[in-house]
Design a protein with these regions (language model features):
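Short capping/connector residues at structural and topological boundaries
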Residues: 11, 106-108, 122-124, 129, ...
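Intrinsically disordered, low-complexity linker/terminal regions across diverse proteins
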Residues: 173, 202-205, 224-228, 285, ...
Length: 393
């Protein structure tokens, strides 16, 4: 450790971090080259270059301040009923926030041939319920409250400390009903299919028609509820908590999502808590790394296609594919030669081997980003919201 001191921007540093660092340098060089030429409007090169440039433009970000979130924040603080709340929750979910609960589509755990709609416990600003409930985390809760107070102050809210305390109290009530990490490991206990009718009747504090419409989720028959009793508690909180508390909670969640892409003052406050206090980082990542990570995340396959064209040509991929095929052939021959395995079992083993799918380096068909619009005339945050919504849909 003395010979290899931890870099201040890292909370940990290992072999995979070295590989990631090397790739970040390569990707940054590719992005820098893109900014030096004029790409065709609508091309992935234009989208990558514009996102990267906006992320680097600290002067513009600082000039805009928190103006990019003003319209959304005003809508959040104007929420007056269940329908408006449900619409705002959907909007924040589309922008990568996570208030009240988490919704997503993934393979059905009991039938991998199907995709299923899932709803899970989510919505805690600090993520883990233990941060709210364990006495040993009292100091962390104070720092979290300080972050919220700072964020609300920078936005210009009245009584920011009081509002921050209300958010922490609300999230603590949620955390009390969250399942522990150990309980979440029980797959069967966290797989609870419900019909759409039963689901919307049981959790009636949310206007699900408005929510699903806002999320772009069409009609469905069944939804998998991860933690029914947790959602019961959230449902009750939405019914009984003052509307002002719900608004402020949504505002806190929204600002935490937006802060890394706004002016330096709010990002510094965000980093102080989420980077330094929560993760142990001593310094912010350099701006170029933060700017580079955005198009790399949102346009990952487009970046990958450009990357492999330079660093992993088709000829290298085919060599690796052939190597894997050789291994498959060798394994097949090995199965046939086993004297302790019955013919029926060998046939099953060969059948299983034949289903092996080879994926090397990059896909045969790349994701199409043509319908995603990146407009440099809009703010950085507005573009990220649009991109996140596009990706979620």
């Amino acid at each position: 450790q003395k010979k290899n001191p931890l870099k201040p921007e890292f909370a940990r540093y290992g072999a995979f971090d070295v590989l990631r660092e090397n790739n970040e340098v390569r990707i940054n060089e590719l992005f820098s080259q893109m900014t030096k030429s004029t790409a065709e409007k609508g091309s992935v090169e234009q989208k990558i270059a514009d996102l990267y440039t906006m992320g680097l433009d600290s002067a513009r970000l600082n000039s805009e301040g928190l103006a990019p979130v003003k319209e959304d924040m005003e809508a959040i603080m104007a929420v007056a009923d269940a329908k408006q709340l449900s619409q705002i929750v959907a909007q924040i979910h589309m922008q990568a926030g996570n208030p009240l609960f988490g919704v997503g589509v993934s393979a059905d755990l009991m039938n991998s041939n199907l995709n299923a709609l899932y709803i899970q416990q989510s919505g805690l600003g600090m993520g883990n319920r233990d941060y709210y409930l364990d006495e040993e985390n009292a100091a962390l809760r104070e720092r979290y409250t300080a972050w919220l107070t700072k964020a609300f102050t920078l936005y210009g809210m009245e009584n920011p400390a009081e509002k921050a305390a209300a958010v922490v109290a609300f999230e603590t009530k949620m955390a009390e009903k969250f399942r522990s990490n150990v309980e979440l490991r029980d797959i069967a206990a966290n797989y609870n299919p419900m019909s759409k009718a039963d689901f919307t009747k049981r959790y009636d504090a949310i206007d699900w028609t408005a929510y699903f419409e806002g999320m772009g989720i069409g009609d469905f028959d069944t939804i998998i509820v991860g933690q029914p009793e947790t959602l019961d508690a959230v449902n009750q909180l939405v019914k009984t908590e003052p509307i002002e508390t719900l608004r402020t909670y949504l505002a806190a969640n929204y600002l935490a999502s937006a802060a890394p892409y706004l002016s330096d003052d709010i990002y510094a406050a965000y980093f102080e808590f989420f980077g330094r206090q929560m993760s142990g980082q001593q310094e912010m990542r350099p701006r170029w790394k933060r700017a580079m990570s955005v198009p790399n995340g949102l346009l990952g396959e487009a970046v990958g296609e450009i990357y492999v064209s330079k660093y992993f040509p088709e000829s290298d991929k085919q060599r690796m594919v052939q190597m894997v095929k050789n291994l498959q052939t060798a394994l097949s021959q090995h199965i046939d030669a086993l004297d302790w395995m019955s013919d029926a079992t060998k046939a099953k083993a060969q059948e299983k081997l034949a289903t092996f799918t080879v994926k090397i380096g990059y896909p045969d068909k790349w994701k199409d980003y043509s319908s995603l619009e990146i407009d440099p005339a809009l703010t950085y945050w507005e573009n990220l919201k649009r991109a996140s919504a596009w990706y979620t849909r």
